[in-house]
Amino acid sequence: MDLKKAALDYHLFPKPGKLSVESSKPCLTQQDLSLAYTPGVAEPVKEIHKDPSNAYKYTNKGNLIAVITNGTAVLGLGNMGALASKPVMEGKAVLFKRFADIDVFDIEINAKTSDEFIQTVVNIAPTFGGINLEDIAAPECFYIEKELKKKLDIPVFHDDQHGTAVVVAAGLINALEIQSKKLEEVKIVFLGAGAAGCSCARLLKSMGARNIIMVDRQGVLDKNRSNLHEINIDLAIEPSAIKTLDDAMQDADVFIGVSAA
């Protein structure tokens, strides 16, 4: 069976999708139902109204994450739109549940602007204990994350930035140890200067890396480039003869590929 058919069958059978919602309490008797819904449900409502922190006692808020996207940077596929990104968001939800027993709602937002996206997330945030931003294109992803962290009182995590950066840093630490090399002495070349690339490079710099060259589809990021934004301008090198990926790879110790294609 080829990969395409196997993947489509996996998502289609025995029922469409990868997620379902199940009750965590017994719902077999009339008494159970009267506690799960009216009239019994009024009691936790009143307790939460008196003290909002009680939501963590009487609801699933503390173990419920929203995996949220606008579908503008889906895997290596690019801007696929909100609806087409749903299988990826369901897949991330499965990982949360399988490896951490964290419950997830996947949410795909059609938003014309970053501010519209932000306001939508702010409006639904009371439901959740945390927000996982996923597959949002750079540079808008940086603005969205920054604004949500300012506006919300729950954790906001952008997986493509911070998740990727942590994994890359861990792998590189081990690889350098095997090679008996030091982070501050190696030359590191990134292909890709979007959300993942910038976040990885910034983390490695904070850990002591001194020689990092970023390359995107237009070549090496240097300070003569006129199209840099606030997130990658601090990663640009001084103008030099290094202009292409081939130039950058001369005597490189580490290559990290985080480009869209």
Descriptions of predicted regions:
Residues 75, 82-100, 158, 162, ...:
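Glycine-rich phosphate/diphosphate-binding loop of Rossmann-like nucleotide-binding domains
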Residues 49-54, 199-200, 240-242, 261:
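Glycine-rich, charged/polar anion/phosphate-binding loops
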Residues 139-142, 198, 258:
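Transmembrane alpha-helical segments of multi-pass membrane transport proteins and ion-pumping complexes
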Residues 26, 110, 137, 161, ...:
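Short beta->alpha junction loops/turns
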Residues 144-151, 242-251, 261:
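Rossmann-fold NAD(P) dinucleotide-binding segment
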Residues 134, 257-258:
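Short, well-ordered coil/turn residues at beta-beta hairpins
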Residues 22-27, 106, 110, 177, ...:
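Short, exposed beta-strand "edge-strand" segments with a Pro/Gly-rich flavor and a Y/T-containing core
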Residues 1-156:
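N-terminal ligand-binding/catalytic initiation module
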